[in-house]
Amino acid sequence: MMTPSQQAQAITNDAGQLTQRVERLAQLAVGIGANVQPGQIVAIGLDAGQEPISRAVAEAAYARGAKFVDLSYFDPHVKRSRLRHAPRETLGFVPPWIGERILAIGEAGAARISFQGPVEPHLLDGIDPELLGIDMLPRTREAIAVTNGQQTNWCILPFPTPGWAELVHPELEPDDAYERLWQQVEWILRLNEPDPVAAWEARLEQLAGIAAKLNGLGLDHLRYNGPDTELTVGLLPGSTWISGAMESIHGVRFTANLPTEEAFTAPDPRRVDGFVTATKPLLIPGAAPIEGLKVRFEAGRAVQIDADNGAETLRAMCAKDEGAARLGEVALVDRESRVGQSGTAFYSILLDENAACHLALGSAYPFSVADGPDRARANQSSIHIDFMVGSDRVTVTGVRADGSEVALLRDGEFVV
């Protein structure tokens, strides 16, 4: 048994280690992540309970010469109160100044940094799942517009919290679960490397090479085959495969997601047919994970959505507008992904989508379609919902317009 002085020292050591971890994460966010520029405004978006990382990012951003750091907190407790008591017909209302602020951030060419990882994962348990598909906050249509217009350099990263750790590792004691989650996030983000930036630059170069190979194949559509999955996803003639490194309209290079393990593009929203089974839980912020998701497509539209639980939430979201029930993104991920190698379901869109091939219902990223008439054909919507469809048992084959085929993924590995 430790003496009181030993206990106090252990607490001090733990606090010091946590501070160092948070500071390293903040440096990654403002560096190879968002790539904050001198004189730039930095907008940080977080949930209540993520204050330590916001302060560390502010410190790191100002040290890089930021002009102003703007913090925006979203409190899911307030959302819970709204969902419990507000009239149903008001749940889709978003005050105009929320969107106006985001548009102003875009017009200013600011840097945007946000963090994922639920602080209280079970807070909205018991809420009608359909209501969760109506109240989309903190997501907004304006944020999608700013992102698609490449007006800002931005980055989304994970931030471990004790509540999230207990969700991911319920088999461990709370303190052990928190430590385990931090260790995994550090490894996935390459923060355990002697030079995390150099490690990410090497990985980004690998992903860029994969995207270049895919772009050289002249593919007309993709075919997915696996357990309870037979899906064909058409591509536009101008569909362009993109990897993690991006550039804003102001010429600032950045990495939008850390981690990033994908090559992605925008499909033809009217040429998707067949059925697909999700290989990991579908995650909608604030809602319980949707398990056992199965979606059937006809002529591009999701015409049937079933799940073991929570299907009502996704159905409500897919009814929001014309493009919500169509695909806006197709992304390929292989087993080189550290997220996938961890063998852990993180219940985080950011992490889990980088563990396996995935599709997204809703808005496309227009910059993943070559400039020209095809760009206007990319899907448009007020939502963007990723769900994972890849595993070692799911094959992905590329098919050219002449019917010739090329294997893309076999046993979870790129074979192009």
What are these regions (language model features)?
Residues 2-273, 398, 404-406, 414-416:
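Active-site bordering "gate/hinge" segments
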Residues 117-119, 160, 228, 237, ...:
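A broadly conserved detector of short glycine/acidic/proline-rich loop/turn motifs that flank catalytic sites
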Residues 302-373, 379:
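Dual-mode signal for accessory low-complexity, basic/Gly-rich regions
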Residues 377-416:
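Extended hydrophobic packing segments that form well-structured cores
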